[in-house]
C-alpha cells in the first residue's frame, strides 16, 4: 500500500509540473493578464495610466547543451493569439495635436515567435513604464 501512495504522489507532482521536469513549477503559463500602462505625448501636458489586458507568462523552451552545426531554434514568447485595439483620449492636448492613443487588448494568448509589429519581446524591465508628466488614472476594465 505504501508503494501505491508513493506512485500516486509522484504522478500528482508530474501532473502539477506539466511533465516539464520542474521547469514550469510556480510559473504562470502564457495567458491574458491585467497590466497598468502609461500613455503620454510630448505635446500634451498630462500622462494617463490605464489598465488593459496583455499577454504574459511562461512558455516552455529548450536550449541545446552541446554545440551543434545547426543555428539555435527560435525561443518562444507569450504573444497575442487574438487581439483588438482600444483607445483613450489624452486630455489637455493643444489644437492640431492628435490626442488619441491606441493600444492592443489581448483576447487570447499563445506561445509563439515574437512579432515585433505588435509585441514587446524584450523581457521584464527593472522599472515599469512610468509617467514623466503629471498623471491621471483611468479605469477601463
Swiss-Prot record:
Keywords recorded for this protein, A-Z: Disulfide bond, Glycoprotein, Hormone, Secreted, Signal
Gene3D superfamilies per UniProt: Cystine-knot cytokines
Disulfide bridge partners, by residue number: 30-78, 44-93, 47-131, 55-109, 59-111, 114-121
A Gene Ontology term for the protein's cellular component: extracellular space
Residues the record marks as carrying a glycan: 34
Subcellular location: Secreted
GO BP: G protein-coupled receptor signaling pathway
Signal sequence coordinates: 1-21
Molecular function (Gene Ontology), one example: hormone activity
Listed PANTHER family: GLYCOPROTEIN HORMONE BETA CHAIN (PTHR11515), LUTROPIN SUBUNIT BETA (PTHR11515:SF11)
Assembly and interaction partners: Heterodimer of a common alpha chain and a unique beta chain which confers biological specificity to thyrotropin, lutropin, follitropin and gonadotropin.
Family assignment from sequence similarity: Belongs to the glycoprotein hormones subunit beta family.
Function: Promotes spermatogenesis and ovulation by stimulating the testes and ovaries to synthesize steroids.
Protein name stated in the entry: Lutropin subunit beta
Amino acid at each position: 500500500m505504501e508503494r501505491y501512495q508513493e506512485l500516486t504522489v509522484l504522478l500528482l507532482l508530474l501532473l502539477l509540473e506539466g511533465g516539464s521536469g520542474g521547469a514550469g513549477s510556480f510559473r504562470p503559463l502564457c495567458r491574458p493578464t491585467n497590466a497598468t500602462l502609461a500613455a503620454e505625448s510630448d505635446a500634451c501636458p498630462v500622462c494617463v495610466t490605464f489598465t488593459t489586458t496583455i499577454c504574459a507568462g511562461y512558455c516552455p523552451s529548450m536550449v541545446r547543451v552541446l554545440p551543434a552545426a545547426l543555428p539555435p531554434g527560435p525561443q518562444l514568447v507569450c504573444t497575442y493569439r487574438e487581439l483588438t485595439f482600444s483607445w483613450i483620449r489624452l486630455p489637455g492636448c493643444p489644437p492640431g495635436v492628435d490626442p488619441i492613443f491606441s493600444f492592443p487588448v489581448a483576447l487570447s494568448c499563445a506561445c509563439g515567435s515574437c512579432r515585433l509589429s505588435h509585441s514587446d519581446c524584450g523581457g521584464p524591465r527593472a522599472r515599469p513604464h512610468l509617467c514623466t508628466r503629471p498623471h491621471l488614472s483611468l479605469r477601463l476594465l
